[in-house]
């Protein structure tokens, strides 16, 4: 997060001037895409995030303005950049310190029929190493929580990371076990790396897809080994959790991945 002093425009060579210039360039790209998408004849049939936002209306039937759409897209892309990269760092750290899981993932990517195990690895990573450990919410009506009376309007911060470490929900919760997600038995409010409810993270689907795709490409293509004996400790950086020293990986050689055979399209 940039300091207000750095965001301010102090002249042509200042960081603030570069920030404003790049922000305007990003705005132009996003607004052009919004305008182009509004003209698409098949908008009603599209299921991507932007199309869903374009069709969304509030309680009074009003759609989102271009400025509101731009802000949502910028939030999704900008806020998701660091968080997704951090989630991937956690994934590599956990996989490299669990060689049997790494070997199974590589085999499933190369020979499996679907992405079930790959998706389970991503979900288990974000359960054991969530990038965001709390989500602010404002109570719309009074609540009693553990004997405490909380009036409407109070801000609460559910400890998402603690929920995901409950032994009654996740047996052997401190262990990295992706197979626990293969049966998709996790309760809706027991897996919360993106929050929950109507204010769940807008970029959740994009982040999951990005993490899966990076692992799909990187794992079969390289022989990877951990540099340290144990996974890196987790620390709080600004509002996100991250590996304390970063995740260092040793690449011993390039592999020739055995690609999963393509399924003919009829």
Predicted features and spans:
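Proline-centered turn/helix-capping motifs that create local helix->coil transitions or kinks
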Residues: 1-3, 33-46, 62, 129-134, ...
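Cytochrome P450 catalytic core segment centered on helix I
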Residues: 1-59, 265
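Cytochrome P450 catalytic-core helices
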Residues: 81-108, 204-222
């Amino acid at each position: 997060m940039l300091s207000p002093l750095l965001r301010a425009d102090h002249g042509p060579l200042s960081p603030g001037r570069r920030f404003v210039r790049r922000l305007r360039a990003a705005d132009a790209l996003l607004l052009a895409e919004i305008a182009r998408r509004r003209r698409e004849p098949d908008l009603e049939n599209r299921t991507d995030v932007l199309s869903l936002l374009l069709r969304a209306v509030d309680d009074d039937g009003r759609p989102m303005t271009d400025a509101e759409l731009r802000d949502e897209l910028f939030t999704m892309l900008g806020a998701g950049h660091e968080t997704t990269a951090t989630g991937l760092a956690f994934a590599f750290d956990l996989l490299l310190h669990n060689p049997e899981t790494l070997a199974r993932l590589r085999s499933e990517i190369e020979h499996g029929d679907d992405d079930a195990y790959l998706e389970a690895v991503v979900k288990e990573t974000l359960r054991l190493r969530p990038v965001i450990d709390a989500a602010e919410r404002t109570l719309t009506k009074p609540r009693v929580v553990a004997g405490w009376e909380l009036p409407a309007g109070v801000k609460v911060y559910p400890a998402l990371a603690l929920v995901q470490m409950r032994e009654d929900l996740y047996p052997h919760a401190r262990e990295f076990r992706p197979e626990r997600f293969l049966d998709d038995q996790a309760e809706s409010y027991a897996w919360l790396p993106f929050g929950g409810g109507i204010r769940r993270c807008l970029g959740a689907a994009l982040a999951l897809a990005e993490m899966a795709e990076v692992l799909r490409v990187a794992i079969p293509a390289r022989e990877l080994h951990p540099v340290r004996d144990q996974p890196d400790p987790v620390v709080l950086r600004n509002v996100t959790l991250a590996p304390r020293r970063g995740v260092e990986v040793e690449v011993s050689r390039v592999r020739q991945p055995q690609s999963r055979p393509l399924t003919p399209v009829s």
